[in-house]
């Protein structure tokens, strides 16, 4: 049996486009959650008093749901590996002014991408190849190695229980 080392997918993303908010204001919030665990991120976003927190919270929920559906991963093993904010197009509206004139109002938009990584999965796994005859070969995928007892750093160990939606 030959064994071949292959790279598996351990990251899942959620993308929010044309969110009506300044990219600078969204970056202030995104910089606080980058590199943190999923549960810690939920606590931070629910307690921060900024308007940018709600769309980012929805994207974090969506990325966790994508990881659960695509990789069958547990929420306690998820970490925000990448989070980036880029500027979108500015929507233009007209504001009526005196004497029949009008001024343009530019509303900035931004695109937010949240990438979630499962720390319990190995990045590489072996593919076993059985040669049945010289013309056909079948590949068997070994099961994913999951470490369920692995826990990420816990910032709040005072026993506070937070509601996870």
UniProtKB/Swiss-Prot annotation:
Signal sequence extent: none
UniProt GO MF annotations: rRNA binding; structural constituent of ribosome
Keyword Ribonucleoprotein on entry: yes
Gene3D superfamilies membership: Ribosomal protein L22/L17 (3.90.470.10)
GO CC, one annotated term: chloroplast
Family listed: Belongs to the universal ribosomal protein uL22 family.
Assembly, per entry: Part of the 50S ribosomal subunit.
Protein name: Large ribosomal subunit protein uL22c
């Amino acid at each position: 049996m030959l064994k071949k080392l292959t790279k598996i997918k351990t990251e899942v993303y959620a993308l929010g486009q044309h969110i009506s908010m300044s990219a600078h204001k969204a970056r202030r919030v995104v910089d606080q959650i980058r590199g943190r665990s999923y549960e810690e991120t939920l606590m931070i976003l629910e307690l921060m008093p900024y308007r940018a927190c709600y769309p980012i919270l929805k994207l974090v929920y969506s990325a966790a749901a994508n990881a659960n559906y695509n990789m069958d991963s547990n929420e306690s093993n998820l970490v925000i590996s990448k989070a980036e904010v880029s500027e979108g197009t500015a929507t233009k509206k007209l504001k009526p002014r005196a004497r029949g004139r009008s001024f343009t109002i530019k509303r900035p938009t931004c695109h937010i991408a949240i990438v979630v990584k499962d720390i319990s999965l190995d990045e590489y796994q072996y593919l076993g190849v059985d040669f049945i005859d010289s013309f056909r070969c079948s590949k068997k995928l070994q099961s994913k190695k999951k470490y369920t007892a692995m826990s990420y750093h816990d910032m709040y160990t005072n026993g506070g229980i937070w509601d996870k939606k």
